A protein has these predicted regions:
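Non-catalytic terminal and connector segments of soluble metabolic enzymes
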Residues: 1-237
Length: 237
């Protein structure tokens, strides 16, 4: 089977889409009947700060970064309803999944999405003006309802960030995993292979872990340069 026919993409149905009861509409746009795409995995996630920071790491330092973290964590759309602060995370798999999904979603800016493709999902989104503490306009934040992986490299990083291997049936798991033989503990931003008072065990012998995550954990405990951040491993636990 050609590789593009087994392509995977992460989709996040964001809090503004949930607030506006657009979940059913969004899922219908990706229906297998129309796209040939299938669910590989789906879960509802209460987004912690580490997960939000890692997902939007490329935007760190930008004027809208703090607002973006509050947005994806549901604080902006559910300020007084903590139980409703969640995201629906989905892995779609199938022919040209990344390209198909991004075309259905439309431009990341809702204004541009409406102008370019009025029927796309993000055409229903909004653009929110942002102001500094003195009330000065500093730019916009796009509340665009949905996230979709931009390319194959991003899809792999994002799927491994939002999902554990055990969240995905083996027959549709796109990336290699391995069974841990060691314990790993976490406390205050640090990972160790031995228990430290106040730390907690997040991986133990017998746990199925992404192979790339295991490599990073071994790099950490051996004091070697990491392939990617500790946060990217910890955020999903």
């Amino acid at each position: 089977m050609p590789e593009q026919n087994r392509e995977s993409s992460l989709v996040l149905i964001k809090p503004d889409a949930l607030k506006n009861s657009l979940t059913g509409y969004i899922l219908s746009q990706f229906a297998e009947f129309h796209t040939g795409l299938r669910f590989a995995a789906l879960k509802v996630v209460a987004v912690n700060l580490a997960l939000a920071e890692e997902h939007y790491a490329e935007h760190k330092g930008k004027f809208f970064y703090a607002s973006l973290l509050e947005y994806i964590r549901g604080y902006l759309h559910y300020p007084d309803e903590p139980s409703k602060r969640r995201v629906i995370a989905i892995i779609y798999r199938g022919p040209n999944a990344i390209k198909q999904i991004r075309e259905i979603c439309g431009n990341t800016n809702p204004h541009e999405a409406r102008a370019q493709r009025p029927g796309c999902i993000r055409a229903l989104g909004t653009v929110i003006p942002l102001y500094d503490k003195n009330g000065k306009f500093i730019g916009d934040r796009s509340d665009n309802l949905i996230h979709a992986s931009a390319n194959a490299q991003d899809a792999e990083r994002e799927i491994k960030l939002w999902f554990l291997p055990t969240d995905i049936p083996p027959t549709v798991r796109s990336y290699p995993a391995e069974t841990s033989k060691e314990y790993y503990y976490y406390k205050n931003g640090a990972v160790s292979a031995e228990y430290v008072p106040g730390s907690y065990c997040f991986i133990g012998p017998g746990d199925l872990v992404w192979k790339s995550d295991m490599k990073v954990l071994r790099q950490i405990t051996k004091g070697k340069k990491q392939d990617y951040s500790t946060n990217a491993v910890i955020a999903k636990y």
